[in-house]
A protein has these predicted regions:
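Bacterial N-terminal signal peptides that target proteins for export
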Residues: 1-10
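Cleavable N-terminal signal peptides
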Residues: 10-12, 21-22
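Predominantly soluble domains enriched in secretory-pathway, periplasmic, or organellar proteins
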Residues: 18-343
Length: 343
C-alpha cells in the first residue's frame, strides 16, 4: 500500500502544532446528525453553525484527517429501532444495504468524494494514520472490518462481541479495541497481524474507549453497568472499575491533555462528569443537554462539546469553570462530535 499520503498528513499535523497559541483557536467542530442525514460544522471561535453537509443515511461515527482536509463519516442504511420497539418488530424493517459505507468529505468544498466500503451497518471506526488502515465496527454483522483507505478496499474482517460499537486504535498503533455491547467485552485486534489477540470482559454494555497518550491504559464506558473500566493494555486485564453515581449511563469519553482527568458524557443522565483517573473520584459535574452522547475537546483543551440527541443541540462546556457557556442548535438527533483544523 502507498502510505505516502498518510505519512504526509501526520507530518502536516505535527507542523501545525508549532504555529502558536493563536492557531489553536482556528478549528471547527463536526457533528453528525443521525436523523437529518447530515453533518453540522460549527466555528470554534464563534460557536455558530457555518455549514451543513449532507453525507448519507444515519451518520454516526466520524473522524478528521490529521491535516484537516478530509472528514470521514460512517453512514448506514440499517433501520433505526428505538428502545421501545421489540426485536421482532425491528427485524421486520428493511435495511438499505447500499447506503452502508464510510463517506469521505473534502472539508474545503464539502463535497462527498467517495463512499468507502465498510461492511454491514458501520457505527464507529478509527484510523491508524501511519498505516492507512481503518477499523470499522459492523454492528449488525458482529465483526470489525479492516479497510485500506488509500485503495478503498476491505482487506480483512475480525469477529467481535455481539453488537460492536466503540472502536479505538492505541496511540502507539499496536492494538485496536472494539466494544461488544451485548457480550460486555472488548475484542483486542493485533494491528500487526490483523487478527484477534484476545477478549477482555468489562462492565455491562460497553460503549466508548479512550487510551492514555502512552498507550498503557484504556478507559471503557459501561453504559448499563454505570461504570468506567480501567484496562492495563500490556496485560489485557481490568485494573479497576470506577462506579459512577446512581442513574449514570456513560457514553462518550475524552481524556484531558495532561492525562489526569477523564471526561464522561453521561447519556440519559443528562450530565458530563470529570473524573480523577487515579481513583475515579468525581471532580466536577455539569448538566448538559438531553442525552449527551458524543464528546469532544477543543485542540487547546479548554472546551468540551457534547452531541445531545433528543434536544438537537450541542453543549459547549468551559473546562476551567465546568459550566455550559453556549448551546448550539444543529440538525436532527446529533450523535457524534469531533474537532478539526479550520482551513
Amino acid at each position: 500500500m502507498n502510505t505516502m499520503r498518510f505519512h504526509s498528513l501526520t507530518l502536516a499535523a505535527l507542523l501545525a502544532l508549532g504555529t502558536g497559541a493563536a492557531a489553536a483557536q482556528d478549528f471547527v467542530i463536526y457533528v453528525t446528525n443521525e436523523d437529518s442525514n447530515d453533518v453540522s460544522i460549527i466555528d470554534g471561535a464563534s460557536n455558530a453553525v457555518i455549514a451543513t453537509v449532507p453525507v448519507g443515511k444515519r451518520p454516526r461515527g466520524l473522524k478528521v484527517s490529521p491535516d484537516g482536509t478530509r472528514l470521514f463519516v460512517a453512514v448506514s442504511g440499517a433501520p433505526k429501532c428505538p428502545p421501545t420497539m421489540d426485536d421482532e418488530e425491528c427485524e421486520k424493517l428493511e435495511a438499505d444495504l447500499a447506503a452502508d459505507g464510510i463517506a469521505e468529505v473534502d472539508t474545503a468544498t464539502h463535497a462527498v468524494l467517495r463512499v468507502l466500503p465498510s461492511g454491514l451497518d458501520p457505527e464507529q471506526f478509527d484510523v491508524n494514520w501511519t498505516t492507512g488502515l481503518m477499523y470499522v465496527a459492523n454492528e449488525n454483522a458482529n465483526q470489525a472490518s479492516i479497510l485500506d483507505v488509500e485503495k478503498g478496499e476491505i482487506v480483512s474482517t475480525v469477529p467481535t462481541g455481539l453488537e460492536p460499537e466503540g472502536v479505538r486504535v492505541s496511540p502507539d498503533g499496536s492494538v485496536a479495541y472494539v466494544t461488544g455491547e451485548v457480550d460486555s467485552d472488548i475484542t483486542v485486534i493485533d494491528t500487526a497481524t490483523g487478527k484477534e489477540k484476545g477478549r477482555i470482559e468489562v462492565g455491562l454494555r460497553p460503549r466508548d474507549i479512550v487510551f492514555s497518550s502512552d498507550s498503557t491504559r484504556a478507559y471503557i464506558s459501561n453504559e448499563v453497568g454505570a461504570s468506567i473500566a480501567v484496562i492495563d493494555v500490556a496485560a489485557s486485564t481490568v485494573l479497576n472499575t470506577f462506579a459512577l453515581p446512581e442513574g449514570s449511563l456513560p457514553m462518550g469519553l475524552v481524556l484531558s491533555q495532561d492525562g489526569q482527568t477523564l471526561y464522561v458524557a453521561n447519556g440519559r443522565a443528562r450530565t458530563v462528569l470529570a473524573l480523577n483517573v487515579v481513583d475515579g473520584a468525581i471532580k466536577s459535574s455539569v448538566e448538559a443537554g438531553r442525552r449527551p452522547w458524543g464528546l469532544a475537546m477543543s485542540p487547546d483543551g479548554s472546551k468540551l462539546y457534547t452531541a445531545n440527541g433528543p434536544s438537537n443541540d450541542v453543549s459547549v462546556i468551559d473546562v476551567a469553570s465546568f459550566t455550559v457557556i453556549a448551546t448550539v442548535p444543529v440538525g436532527s438527533t446529533p450523535w457524534g462530535v469531533w474537532t478539526g483544523p479550520k482551513l
